[in-house]
């Protein structure tokens, strides 16, 4: 079982966002990333402590910046399961007012909507009702759709897990293959399953492997480091194009683009 604590950075203005981005750029310029020297670790902690320390967010529950806690487990047998926990308010009079309780797994419908042919029309209806947002990867999966619970209480993983339904349409510059991919890769199950990991080449599930040998760089997935000449094949019946990834490079490019933009241009763009 593994767990990840995901925090919210409370950067409330454009200048706050740019200043926070500059802190990460300064860290990169000041230190080589490996090996992690004491100076690097101290500099890194000066960036993360203001976000993760107790009381870092006085206006939030328990004064915490925690956004969600996510766990992955495969205790007895397959499937691998991911769950999400958020700080939730307890009834008045409870000894602790806000505690971590299980929540829905965001952006991820229940797997039955792709695995059960009788329920696939519900997934198809949601996707085809939100084609423009899915094409732009700006959609938000709702808790319910067509009068029934839609969001998953847990995300199940098999080596080729993905979301698909017959009748998915295209929109604008996005083919039906693009629409299916954009929707599925943004789910927990697809990103850690068949949409971003090739079971023929890649270790299952993890993008950052917890069992890397001590004293050596952590093992990262090809989704992060780059797929090179072996793109991730489409796992769905659409049999679409293979997809190339290099997400660490994408994030670095996004950071540089942000730093080069400036607040005036960001304000005009918004």
Stretches found by the model and what they are:
Residues 181, 190, 203-205:
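C-terminal structured domains
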Residues 1-157, 195, 228-237, 241-265:
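Conserved small-residue
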Residues 177-183:
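Short, flexible, mixed-charge glycine/proline-rich loop motifs
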Residues 185-195:
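The canonical Cys-X-X-Cys-His
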Residues 147-175:
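Short, charged low-complexity linear segments at domain edges
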Residues 268-270:
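Short, solvent-exposed mixed-charge patches
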Residues 198-220:
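Gly/Gly-Pro-rich "capping" loops immediately C-terminal to redox-active cysteine motifs
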Residues 10, 131, 170, 184-187:
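Secretory pathway export signals and precursors
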